Curated annotation (Swiss-Prot):
GO terms for cellular component: plasma membrane-derived thylakoid membrane. GO terms for molecular function: heme binding. HAMAP family: CytC_CcsA. It is a multi-pass membrane protein. This is Cytochrome c biogenesis protein CcsA. The keyword Transmembrane applies. Keywords: Cytochrome c-type biogenesis, Membrane, Thylakoid, Transmembrane, Transmembrane helix. May interact with ccs1.
Amino acid sequence: MNLVSLQNSLDNATFAILLPTLLCYWTGVAFPNLKGLPAIGTAGMAIANLCMAALLGARWLEAGYFPISNLYESLFFLAWGLTAIHLLAEKLSGSRLVGAATSPLALGIVAFAAFTLPKEMRQAEPLVPALKSNWLMMHVSVMMVSYAALLVGSLLSVAFLVVTRGQAIELRGSSVGTGSFRQVKLNRASDLTIATAESGGSGGTAVLEQPVLQLAPEQLSLADTLDNVSYRVIGLGFPLLTIGIIAGAVWANEAWGSYWSWDPKETWALITWLVFAAYLHARITRGWQGRRPAILATVGFGVVWVCYLGVNLLGKGLHSYGWFF
């Protein structure tokens, strides 16, 4: 079997593995008494991750360069990163809901790359002179892994909003750094709560009134875990995004003589950085937990997709892959 046929077999195999994996996770969420399904789903994600690693390795051998230079390659690299980050997040959370959230995204990316892209966009081509640089691996791979981490973290925030139905809840665990400690007490006589927020060392007290959703202990524990793991995964993706942007600026200066040219991709990378910087700032310095940072991360989910795929398909700028519809 030649390398091209091997790649075709591996991308089809990845799709064939991820589809039943998704069904396992969703069935496990719908029927919690079926205890073995999450383990099958985890195994499916791990096997899919290995298939994509083998596909990228075969592509590297065929083309002679790190396989991340076109849309097909970057989509599979992103899906590989998603499945890897998923395995980390699932280990941290121990929840089958992680797979129920991330497996559809991984499956959709693989299906788009394997079955939607035109054949000419799936073929390896010689690198243009500007891409014949070690910065290709440094910049693009770090950016793609950061996208994967930010997407998984944002999806966990979406899952948090689903579990809590978008309502304010009491979170007893702490997933913040130096932020204020907040304790919420439920007023049994009404649907309102009086929340007392004490800032460390300031002596100030703020009294707030807002409805708080009452959850079963299992749901409350799950929501707290999703909030915590989402924060940690986004905390992993943000420094990688920062490193990737800096590496891209250095590469741009070497290739075109300018660190920053306000290319659409550069602009949206900056917007993405600002959104998640605001998220981390709110959590670390303001002590945000629960609904508000989850909403901000959900916005970030859309921003990442615009940054990665939206501006690339417009056919404009130095990062364009070209529109194909």
